[in-house]
Amino acid sequence: MSPFLRIGLSNFDCGTCQACQGEAVNPYCAVLVKEYVESENGQMYIQKKPTMYPPWDSTFDAHINKGRVMQIIVKGKNVDLISETTVELYSLAERCRKNNGRTEIWLELKPQGRMLMNARYFLEMSDTKDMSEFENEGFFALHHRRGAIKQAKVHHVKCHEFTATFFPQPTFCSVCHEFVWGLNKQGYQCRRCNAAIHKKCIDKVIAKCTGSAINSRETMFHKERFKIDMPHRFKVYNYKSPTFCEHCGTLLWGLARQGLKCDACGMNVHHRCQTKVANLCGINQKLMAEALAMIESTQQARTLRDSEHIFREGPIEISFPRSIKSETRPPCVPTPGKSEPQGICWESPLDGADKTAQPPEPEVNLQRASLQLKLKIDDFILHKMLGKGSFGKVFLAEFKRTKQFFAIKALKKDVVLMDDDVECTMVEKRVLSLAWEHPFLTHMFCTFQTKENLFFVMEYLNGGDLMYHIQSCHKFDLSRATFYAAEVILGLQFLHSKGIVYRDLKLDNILLDRDGHIKIADFGMCKENMLGDAKTNTFCGTPDYIAPEILLGQKYNHSVDWWSFGVLLYEMLIGQSPFHGQDEEELFHSIRMDNPFYPRWLEREAKDLLVKLFVREPEKRLGVRGDIRQHPLFREINWEELERKEIDPPFRPKVKSPYDCSNFDKEFLSEKPRLSFADRALINSMDQNMFSNFSFINPGMETLICS
């Protein structure tokens, strides 16, 4: 982290300057931070960040980089400039360091006047031996929760890069030429050529995207494949009624010469869209796609018949009559075996969903399904809201039948669809269904849904999360941090053994049970099927924890979890993040380039582990190469006993009752626990079949209900 100054400005004295008389009664200041750069014209200072307007007697932070200066301008309501001065931040930092980390000086302004400025220097917590000084100042880097981010999912079709898009104005599909209905992110739009389509029409796109179709590979593609090379004959046209562009789908604005019209097929486009329209004059993409699909299905059926014919005739040519006779035996009916049930999926017909006949199921499944069909949100009493976000809310809920307490995560279907996160929700459900196999993963009992919401019923962990606890003690001692880290390692290694990359490890997602053992929670960012050499390249995670290979756009595997684990361990031991920046751009630059600062008081084994986790070459990072369990920091850990929870945790949270929620943020607990209702029109237009495989029951839920 680069050091920074916390600066406060106050007591502006205009002096004897007559020009500011009357305006100096209530002046304000502007702060411009400028960077030193070398250019062809010589040395110069450039402002890269927005101008700040700090109120008097307030503070702001300025990072100390070589050559960075701060220009302070005092202004009045009717006067552009009263006075100003420029301060070199490095010199100000040196003055602070010589005066026990703080200074207070009068700045002489030009042309006249002066201002009182106080500054305090911050680097790392290691610069202060007395923790009480930080407690009095209230300065800790880990004072707020940090949300995860995920790059929009890109659908690659014929070189198009379609992403779910919100259309702020009426838009028509460029494939079927029908209106794109719905709210929020109604359809897809190509990031390269701006073509807008329905989500349902994505399989009907036949034109390749190159960003520009003139003399492009797209023309050659259709010329060779379909013998189609029909350029449009566009001419400027005056439209007398509202008309929409048939490429990007939006309205042609203006009073005259609003767009272009093809003389041959009558296609209407914007001037800006002309160069992006494919040479498909007179071609109906929808009908063409349906015809091609029919041809393909016919060819596949013919190929399948030919392969079956060859398979049947093959043994006769080899002359194995007895084998042929044995093939005519009636098929065997499988008998049910004694296998432990891993969970039962069921779906009750939702209002507005298609009700189709389902094949009969085994009797045991029908019995369980009949029991679980009764599970709905009305079977629970919502006592408190434990947390919320854009996705939905988390509640403390009591099951009416057994008086047991659960944590219910309620997702809003409209938000899930709007963010194109249906598959992420299904992944979270599948990962949670595996969690019963490991003690340090949050256990899920069941999932169910209504027309508006998706519900995860999980165990209630009333010990709170590590972010809540670290805010009260600022950092964990070595034994406590080591214990938590060891249990996190076991949880991560279990997920990796199942081909799952977690991708969102952070203090907020590590919960404590009433005994003080950790539980990893929130699996919405997980990636499945990552065994062997499999890799992915989705940009996602919480900014402070994102690995450098993700920022560089490289393909990655479970190596990113070990980088995030290093950030987590650093925060537990030192009390703040290893990488910093005033915005995401600076933070990501710090992650890619900077080396974390290690305080002098940090144990040698802990520093060695962090250094090996913060290796920027993924294949050389500890956890990917080498056994992290064998590191000297964990030499006193008995891993088998730890996994059996036979080692007492160093900290036991204060829990008064099974429904105690005192270890959660008060800002959420004070709100009324109720579901957020979605827009009725949007819900009615939603395809409920997208969530047809969501509902699930774990055998553990049946055991709890029937006990």
UniProtKB/Swiss-Prot annotation:
Q: How is it modified after translation?
A: Autophosphorylation at Thr-219 is required for targeting to the TCR and cellular function of PRKCQ upon antigen receptor ligation. Following TCR stimulation, phosphorylated at Tyr-90 and Ser-685.
> Ranges for the C2 domain?
1-107
The reaction(s) catalysed by this protein are: L-seryl-[protein] + ATP = O-phospho-L-seryl-[protein] + ADP + H(+); L-threonyl-[protein] + ATP = O-phospho-L-threonyl-[protein] + ADP + H(+)
Q: Which Pfam families match?
A: C1_1, PKC_C2, Pkinase, Pkinase_C
Q: State which gene encodes it.
A: Prkcq
Write the Enzyme Commission number(s) for this entry: 2.7.11.13
Tell me what topology the record assigns in the membrane. Peripheral membrane protein
Q: How is its activity regulated?
A: Novel PKCs (PRKCD, PRKCE, PRKCH and PRKCQ) are calcium-insensitive, but activated by diacylglycerol (DAG) and phosphatidylserine. Three specific sites; Thr-538 (activation loop of the kinase domain), Ser-676 (turn motif) and Ser-695 (hydrophobic region), need to be phosphorylated for its full activation.
- Name-wise, this protein is Protein kinase C theta type
PANTHER family referenced in this protein's UniProt entry, alphabetically: RIBOSOMAL PROTEIN S6 KINASE
Sequence ranges assigned to domain AGC-kinase C-terminal in this UniProt record: 635-706
Q: Which Gene3D superfamilies match?
A: 3.30.60.20, C2 domain, Phosphorylase Kinase, domain 1, Transferase(Phosphotransferase) domain 1
- Quaternary structure annotation from Swiss-Prot or TrEMBL: Part of a membrane raft complex composed at least of BCL10, CARD11, MALT1 and IKBKB. Interacts with GLRX3 (via N-terminus). Interacts with ECT2. Interacts with CCDC88A/GIV; the interaction leads to phosphorylation of CCDC88A and inhibition of its guanine nucleotide exchange factor activity. Interacts with CD28.
Q: Where are the zinc fingers (Phorbol-ester/DAG-type)?
A: 159-209, 231-281
Q: Where are the catalytic residues?
A: D504 (proton acceptor)
Residue ranges constituting the Protein kinase domain according to the UniProt record: 380-634
Cofactor(s) recorded in Swiss-Prot or TrEMBL: Mg(2+)
Q: Does the keyword Nuclease apply?
A: no
